[in-house]
Amino acid sequence: MNFDIEKLEKIKVRDGQEFFFIQTFGCQMNEEDSEKLSGMLKSQGYEETENRDEASIVIFNTCCVRENAENKVFGNLGRLKNQKEKNPNLIIALCGCMMQQKGMADEILSRFPYVDIIFGTHNAYKFPEYLHRVQVEGVQVKEIFDKETEIVEGVPIDRKSNVKAFVTIMYGCNNFCTYCVVPYVRGRERSRRPEDIENEIKELVSNGYKEITLLGQNVNSYGKGLEEEITFAQLLRRINEIDGLERLRFMTSHPKDLTLDVVYAIRDCDKLCEQIHLPVQSGSNEILQKMNRHYNKEQYLELAKKIREEIPDVTFSTDIIVGFPGETEEDFEETINLVKEVRYDAAFTFIYSRRNHTPADKMEDQIPDDVKHDRFNRLVAAVNEGIVVGNKAAEGKIYEVLVEGTSKNNENKLTGRTRNAKLVNFDGCKEMIGKLVKVKIIEAKSFSLVGEVVEQ
């Protein structure tokens, strides 16, 4: 199904300057969804602002993977009450995964009756229509689709970078890990047609983009439900043939579905970067079984070993949860041992967060908070130790770096990433932004590298 761009023309901003503000919580999928919301609004004539106080439209794109993300949304909504009282014409909209949870929309409208629009993950493309109804009819709009819809192509998108871009290749998840709400709020797996993906990337490349990251809750499941038989590895090889594309990445991979065909594609394809995000979640077989992950520690380690054999320069990142129900000290030590054996270059570490309507929420032996926090701190220390070792090994080497922009911490420095995703800061002129440059690493920091440009 194609987005109706002509409908936007009919509901454009006609008079004056109108600003919108979007705050995004959660993952890269949410980031891309927010880029689409921004794209639709800018197509209507609105302008984006980073100052929430001057906005006439405030949107919170929410996440529900962890309780902390939900609490941040509630806190921000509470702080909007005064702004709404000062400006009754302010329109407040909520969308994203949190809204898909059973009863959540009604709870929000009960606690925060000044919210104007609530919609979910399956109908974000209809936001301009909801906005128009609020503006013209003065109604409150709540519309949550229980079932996933046909994939909508051609939604305007406002990219936040001119160098690299996210491209979603599939939506939803069929795995039902016992701690996770994603299958309930994002729906079942469904894939975009390969030609739609290729056309989007070709357009991005023609506009100067150098790096593409393919997104999906489980990219290795790509191809299910399509008329054309195609695997994720085959898609990667097709995209690798696109002229002008410099780099290609993907996330997220489920270890049980990452095939050797994908590993060989990374090895063989010159544009595929030597970096894999491979969430392990736990190093304990008992906990992995309770999580419903469908692999064990030995299988994960064998996969990591095989990947390193085929792609010597590869770096791994991962997701790890501590404090899952029933996790013993011995289980946790197995996780620490796995972290030391694999030696990750980055890790997203989390304290287990109970989620309503998930099997893990009903499990016995919930872990006390003080134990969870102690294990979390020890895990972070073990992960960081491995990161430092990896960074030290980069000293003295020369890497190809894609210059992404100026450093967040020092606008006089440039920043970019190597093919294997190491962050490098270095001196250089802003004309280098968007270009590939050779950089020699002169110092390893805890979470980044310091380099100097080698003569081009």
UniProtKB/Swiss-Prot annotation:
SUPFAM superfamilies in the record: Radical SAM enzymes
Binding-site list for [4Fe-4S] cluster 2: 173, 177, 180
CC cofactor: [4Fe-4S] cluster
EC number: 2.8.4.3
Residues annotated as binding [4Fe-4S] cluster 1: 27, 63, 97
Free-text comment on the cofactor: Binds 2 [4Fe-4S] clusters. One cluster is coordinated with 3 cysteines and an exchangeable S-adenosyl-L-methionine.
Chloroplast as UniProt keyword: no
Domain of life: Bacteria
Radical SAM core domain segment(s): 159-391
One Pfam family this sequence matches: UPF0004
Keywords: 4Fe-4S, Cytoplasm, Iron, Iron-sulfur, Metal-binding, S-adenosyl-L-methionine, Transferase, tRNA processing
Top-level class of the enzyme under EC nomenclature: transferase
Listed GO CC annotations: cytosol
Matching SMART domains: Elp3
UniProt domain TRAM: residue ranges: 392-455
GO molecular function, one term: 4 iron, 4 sulfur cluster binding
PROSITE patterns referenced in this protein's UniProt entry, alphabetically: MTTASE_N, MTTASE_RADICAL, RADICAL_SAM, TRAM
Domain MTTase N-terminal: 18-136
Catalyzed reactions: N(6)-dimethylallyladenosine(37) in tRNA + (sulfur carrier)-SH + AH2 + 2 S-adenosyl-L-methionine = 2-methylsulfanyl-N(6)-dimethylallyladenosine(37) in tRNA + (sulfur carrier)-H + 5'-deoxyadenosine + L-methionine + A + S-adenosyl-L-homocysteine + 2 H(+)
UniProt-listed InterPro entries: Elp3/MiaA/NifB-like_rSAM (IPR006638), Methylthiotransferase (IPR005839), Methylthiotransferase_CS (IPR020612), Methylthiotransferase_N (IPR013848), Methylthiotransferase_N_sf (IPR038135), MiaB_methiolase (IPR006463), rSAM (IPR007197), rSAM_horseshoe (IPR023404)
Keyword Iron-sulfur: yes
Disulfide bonds: none
Family assignment from sequence similarity: Belongs to the methylthiotransferase family. MiaB subfamily.
Described purpose of this protein according to its UniProt entry: Catalyzes the methylthiolation of N6-(dimethylallyl)adenosine (i(6)A), leading to the formation of 2-methylthio-N6-(dimethylallyl)adenosine (ms(2)i(6)A) at position 37 in tRNAs that read codons beginning with uridine.
Subunit: Monomer.
Record-given protein name: tRNA-2-methylthio-N(6)-dimethylallyladenosine synthase
Underlying gene: miaB
